[in-house]
Amino acid sequence: MNHTVQTFFSPVNSGQPPNYEMLKEEHKVAVLGVPHNPAPPTSTVIHIRSKTSVPHHVVWSLFNTLFMNPCCLGFIAFAYSVKSRDRKMVGNVTGAQAYASTTKCLNIWALILGILMTILLIIIPVLIFQAHR
């Protein structure tokens, strides 16, 4: 019986460098050389904004709509506040800020007119009652 040993792998320390295939990118670098750029490397700065808080004033608008709604300002403010909230959810921050600013102005006017109407509704009957005495 003849026992011959066949090796499928070459020995590790055979004294010859292993035969590797050269990748396409390595071949390009070897042929062209490392790129030399005389200009200094430039950097790009990216400013990432944090989430901007845009108040939409839905609760304030709802309060003005339900309790003090002079000249329908509370209802209009509520419509604008819903638009502001929708723009904020979509990611349109500038549109949301514009609608929020209008909502705030309408809510302030609705509150002022509502308070004045409440005061007048209290004062006028008192004055009329005192005049009839």
Curated annotation (Swiss-Prot):
UniProt crosslink position (Glycyl lysine isopeptide (Lys-Gly) (interchain with G-Cter in ubiquitin)): K24, K83, K88, K104
UniProt topological domain (Cytoplasmic) ranges: 79-107
Keywords: Isopeptide bond, Membrane, Transmembrane, Transmembrane helix, Ubl conjugation
GO biological process: defense response to virus; host-mediated suppression of symbiont invasion; negative regulation of viral genome replication; response to interferon-alpha; response to interferon-beta; response to type II interferon; type I interferon-mediated signaling pathway
Keyword rRNA-binding among UniProt keywords: no
A single cellular component GO annotation: plasma membrane
Predominant subcellular localization, coarse grouping: membrane
Extracellular side: 1-57, 129-133
Annotated membrane topology: Multi-pass membrane protein
InterPro entries linked to this entry: CD225/Dispanin_fam, IFITM_antiviral_protein
Segments traversing the membrane: 58-78, 108-128
Subcellular location: Membrane
Record bears the keyword Transmembrane: yes
Superkingdom of source: Eukaryota
Family: Belongs to the CD225/Dispanin family.
Protein name, as recorded: Putative dispanin subfamily A member 2d
